[in-house]
């Protein structure tokens, strides 16, 4: 586990909020295990503050809070329960947000994050094995987002 004390923004860093839940962990661990993402470019946040499941991937950054995720990452995956949203400190600016949250429509995300580029993705249980069929819907994206 790595902690960063001062903001060190890197465009390639991916933040996963809810990174130890089944969808967030499915994404994070599959990206790492398949070599699609470097551990040093993955920032995770969860309620417990634990690295459950990520111990075999030194360099993964465990964020303290949403402010730290936003300071470190250009792209943020929201994989939390709808009742836990919005999170304290949620102010993503113009970052790319990918929401896995059930029952939180894009309109609500756009209301809370008017500058963000928003993608609503709906992975299923196959996410834990890297075999999820994941339909998605996007608002306005930049060419670099795709």
PLM feature spans:
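Conserved N-terminal Rossmann-fold NAD(P)-binding element of oxidoreductases
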Residues: 14-22
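Short acidic capping loops at alpha-helix termini that bridge into adjacent secondary structure
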Residues: 38-41
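Structured catalytic/translocation cores of nucleotide/phosphate-coupled proteins
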Residues: 9-10, 71
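Short helix-loop capping/hinge motifs at secondary-structure junctions, enriched
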Residues: 141-145
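Rossmann-like NAD(P)(H) cofactor-binding subdomain of soluble oxidoreductases
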Residues: 22, 27-29, 43, 49-51, ...
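Short, acidic, metal-binding catalytic loop of nucleotide-sugar glycosyltransferases
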Residues: 35
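A short, basic/flexible loop-to-alpha-helix module at the beginning of a structural domain
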Residues: 1-9
């Amino acid at each position: 586990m790595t902690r960063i004390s001062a903001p060190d923004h890197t465009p390639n860093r991916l933040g996963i909020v809810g990174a130890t839940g089944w969808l967030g962990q499915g994404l994070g661990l599959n990206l790492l295990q398949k070599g699609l993402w470097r551990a040093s470019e993955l920032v995770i946040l969860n309620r417990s503050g634990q690295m459950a499941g990520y111990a075999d991937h030194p360099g993964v950054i465990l964020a303290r809070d949403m402010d730290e995720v936003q300071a470190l990452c250009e792209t943020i995956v929201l994989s939390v329960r709808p009742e836990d949203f919005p999170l304290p400190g949620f102010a993503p600016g113009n970052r790319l947000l990918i929401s896995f949250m059930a029952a939180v429509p894009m309109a609500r995300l756009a209301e809370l994050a008017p500058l963000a580029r928003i993608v609503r993705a709906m992975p299923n249980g196959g996410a834990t094995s890297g075999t999820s069929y994941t339909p998605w819907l996007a608002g306005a994206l930049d060419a670099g987002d795709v």
